[in-house]
Amino acid sequence: MIMEINKYKILAALVRSFFDAFSSGIIDNSDVAAEERRQPKNVKQSMLNHYEHVAPVFFDTIFFPLAAMNFQYDDIMRIVREAQGRGDDMHGLVKTACASDAMYEAMVAEYKRNFSALLGGRCVSVASHLEDYTRPAEGADVEMLDAERAIELTVRVVMYAYARGLRHSVADGKPLLRQATLFRLLLDAMNVLLSDEAAKYDDCEDDLAAMFLKVCQSQHNFTVMTSEMDRTYDELVSKEEIDGNDTMTK
């Protein structure tokens, strides 16, 4: 069982998961017929319609997970206070949360790669991501993070990004977290976080639990994932005014 994951792999998983989830939230509430929403021209148009929202929502969503990956809680609070004192914006906060120039440059590279793909009409596939995500320079010291914490942070990014995509595409009322979309997002997120190749589900026979166990790689990791889903769900209902009646957790 994987006990630790290198931070570059986690960073790449967080960024891809944000773009997959945020774009899915927007697309789920598109006026286009459901069977046509994922066509490249419609994906591209959906992202162009919300172009100005992407960076602000990205910074707001990714700051805490990045900071939690690199700092202790007390240090995060200090970083926020110091940034406020300097008048830093969210971009500046996120740069500080990266903790090193190399990690910040990796984040920027992943941001550009994922956003460019969506503007071209597609999300970066799991296989393409695992082949091409930004690695550390050869010979560089690479810090590791406990796999449990990495899973929790990734789940948080998926659910917050999806919810915020929904909110930006709903004019009135509470947006609905769609169960099928959330399952797909989490399957892909766990795949890119915990594996080095795209999962094949031929032997799962459409059994969702078997699919999740495959990408989570253990019952323990699956439990960590679902527990974080419950915690994040409660936050979304209270803070983001999300209607979660269609989710699997409640």
Sequence positions of predicted segments:
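Extended non-catalytic scaffold regions that mediate assembly and binding
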Residues: 1-8, 13-59, 66-155, 165-250
